[in-house]
Amino acid sequence: PDELPTTLSTLMAKAMNDQSIPPGEGILHHAEGIDLIPANIELAGLEVSLVNCMNREKMLKQVLEGAKHDYDFILLDCTPSLGMLTVNALAADTTLIPVQAQYLSAKGLEQLLQTVQKVRRQINPKLKIEGILLTMTDSRTNYGQQIDNLIRGAYGSKIKVFDQTIPRSVRAAEISAVG
């Protein structure tokens, strides 16, 4: 993504500078039918600029506006933080909350849910939580089972916790290192 002429940070910078974004700009089309807008480390730097931007909570929505009618779903993969980019992603219609099956991630879930409530009150009252998806699970260990039970027990009565989980995979870690 570092060599690509257009990334998500390029598009968001255009939106922040009130420049038009042609529909489809920056979208890469994969042969398997999945399209994506790549991002790179520049996006983290752009987040600092968002703080001083008017309508800063909706810049990402503005970027995606021209393309949203071409898709049934647009998935936004956010970093595990509660910064301005995550708030921008919460301008979506719905959110699916992935949570690593680890203690600190489970603790961070409460903060994220508080942020979602604040976004509902102040920015996007229609935001719906689709559910919680447990990731990096390892049902073979007591610890993995305890975290699974902890999240289901604490949130399962209020928010759907999907039965399907994404297991821990060494292969996934290897692939992410390649890019």
Show the residue positions of the predicted features.
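P-loop NTP-binding core
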Residues: 1-179
